[in-house]
Amino acid sequence: MRRTLYRLMIELTNGRFTSYILRKFAQSRLSSIIIPSYVKVFQINQDEMEKGLKEYGTLHDLFTRRLKEGKRSIDTDASSIVSPVDGVFADQGPIEDTKTFDIKGKRYSIVDMLGNEERAKRYAGGTYMVIYLSPSHYHRIHSPLSGSVTERFVLGRKSYPVNAAGMEYGKEPLSKNYRSVTEVNSDGEHMALVKVGAMFINSIELLHERSTVQKGEEMAYFTFGSTVVLLFEKDMIKAVQELTSGQELRLGEKIATRVSHK
């Protein structure tokens, strides 16, 4: 019953018009009135922000803020995979040979997430990682490794919540929501960075258009909190043992080690 009611309420409120109004408000000067309250409620660290609070003219400007130089360091070990975002570590584990994995009692299909069988098959037997970004986090997304960009594509139209309630009661939001995917070939092994849109402010802006990317390089930004999913080929990485669900991660922090190079 809870799941049914939850989905009904989301469908009633999650329309294009609502998203349009919220997006326009966030981009308007009027939204600057609530910036101080937003910063206080979500406990945003002002010392890390590139600019002073009064220099952000809209909520959108605040959502997409950059950090001061030197506030994040990228792990320099050649074999390391780093967190592409500031966020909360949600889960990690094996991708089954059936190209599926389970989170919070839900089975997710890599075929659905990536749009077709051809893309998905290279990740069978591999590893997934999920990191959640709340409204308080820095919203820019960076590359977790260096390599050549092999494909960029967008899937889905609508987005549903990716918070705890959304993950429990929603319809596989990680593979159904609007999402932007970047695939990277690193020394012959592939990784997919899946940027999952959030409900209402359903926008992911790509900033990187070159054919190569360096570890820690800025790639995109969310205009509100959301989620990233990392997919790795079989036997490509070993996750850091200390990672636990609910753990805060910072951009550039080591989350895994490369275990083989083809």
From Swiss-Prot:
Cellular location(s): Cell membrane
Chief place where the protein resides: membrane
Pathway the protein acts in: Phospholipid metabolism; phosphatidylethanolamine biosynthesis; phosphatidylethanolamine from CDP-diacylglycerol: step 2/2
PTM notes: Is synthesized initially as an inactive proenzyme. Formation of the active enzyme involves a self-maturation process in which the active site pyruvoyl group is generated from an internal serine residue via an autocatalytic post-translational modification. Two non-identical subunits are generated from the proenzyme in this reaction, and the pyruvate is formed at the N-terminus of the alpha chain, which is derived from the carboxyl end of the proenzyme.
Reaction equation(s) it catalyzes: a 1,2-diacyl-sn-glycero-3-phospho-L-serine + H(+) = a 1,2-diacyl-sn-glycero-3-phosphoethanolamine + CO2
Disulfide bonds: none
EC number: 4.1.1.65
Active site (record annotation): D86 (charge relay system), H142 (charge relay system), S226 (charge relay system), S226 (schiff-base intermediate with substrate)
Site (Cleavage (non-hydrolytic)): G225, S226
Cofactor stoichiometry and binding remark: Binds 1 pyruvoyl group covalently per subunit.
Enzyme class name: lyase
Cofactors, names only: pyruvate
Keywords: Cell membrane, Decarboxylase, Lipid biosynthesis, Lipid metabolism, Lyase, Membrane, Phospholipid biosynthesis, Phospholipid metabolism, Pyruvate, Zymogen
UniProt cross-references to InterPro entries, sorted A to Z: PS_Dcarbxylase (IPR003817), PSD-B (IPR033177), PSD_type1_pro (IPR033178)
Topology term for the membrane: Peripheral membrane protein
Residue positions where Pyruvic acid (Ser) is found in the record: S226
GO CC field: plasma membrane
Alphabetized GO MF terms: phosphatidylserine decarboxylase activity
Reported function: Catalyzes the formation of phosphatidylethanolamine (PtdEtn) from phosphatidylserine (PtdSer).
Similarity comment: family membership: Belongs to the phosphatidylserine decarboxylase family. PSD-B subfamily. Prokaryotic type I sub-subfamily.
Assembly and oligomerization: Heterodimer of a large membrane-associated beta subunit and a small pyruvoyl-containing alpha subunit.
Name used for this protein in its record: Phosphatidylserine decarboxylase proenzyme
The organism of origin for this protein: Bacillus mycoides (strain KBAB4)
